[in-house]
Structure formats: C-alpha cells, structure tokens
Amino acid sequence: MKHFAWIVATLLSFNAFAHHGWSWAEEEQTELKGTIESISMSPPHPVLKVKAADGIWQVDLGNPNQTERSGFTGESAKAGDTIVVLGNRSLEKDKKHMKAVRITVGERQLDLYPERIKKN
C-alpha cells in the first residue's frame, strides 16, 4: 500500500510540474489581442480571461509573487480593459489557453518572464 501511495504522489507531482512548467505549451510565442473579461489573483497562479476575436482565452500569469514583482496586481487592470498578451499557447490547438510572458494593458507593458521573451 505504501508503494502505491508513493506512485500516486509521484504522478500527481509530475502532473503539477508539467502544468506549471512550459512542457504543455508551444515553443513559438503568439500575440493575443482582446478585452479582459475577468481577473483571478488566486493561487496557484493568477489567471485572466480574455475575449478575443475567436473566443474567450484563459491566460495564465506567473505565480502570485512573480506576477506582483512584474508590476501586475489585482488593481492593475479591470474587466473591459484592452490587453495584448505575448505568450506560449497550449499544444492542444482546440484549447484557447496560453501562458503569458508579457502583457500590455493600455500603455503599461509588464514582463512576467523577461528571460523567456523571444526577440524577433
């Protein structure tokens, strides 16, 4: 039974790591333009729902501390604000889901993962 519990714990840890890492996302970065529908600053990471021309997207930000260090807090934007997101979208093309490396709200550009931003 202990062996089974260890296997389950290991698999759950791997799934959490895969989700919070980058392995679930494309290598190429994509730009998404839209309007913020909602903002959640809850752990494990803040999430924006963004209404774009092709539907509602889930945009994952960094962990709460990292997101705040980038300059983004729950007061930085509101529903209805225009946003441009640079990030890596899900490998699953049918999902409107991406992880942001940079967001621009109005004139304010915030780099969540500056080391991951690819120069074109």
Where on the chain are the PLM-derived regions?
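Positively charged n-region of N-terminal signal peptides that target proteins for export
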Residues: 1-4
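N-terminal signal peptide c-region/cleavage motif recognized by signal peptidases
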Residues: 13-15
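Short, glycine/small-residue-enriched coil/turn segments at secondary-structure junctions
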Residues: 22-39
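Short aromatic-glycine-enriched beta-strand elements
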Residues: 42-51
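Short nucleic-acid-contacting surface segments enriched for D/E, G, S/T with interspersed K/R
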Residues: 69-84
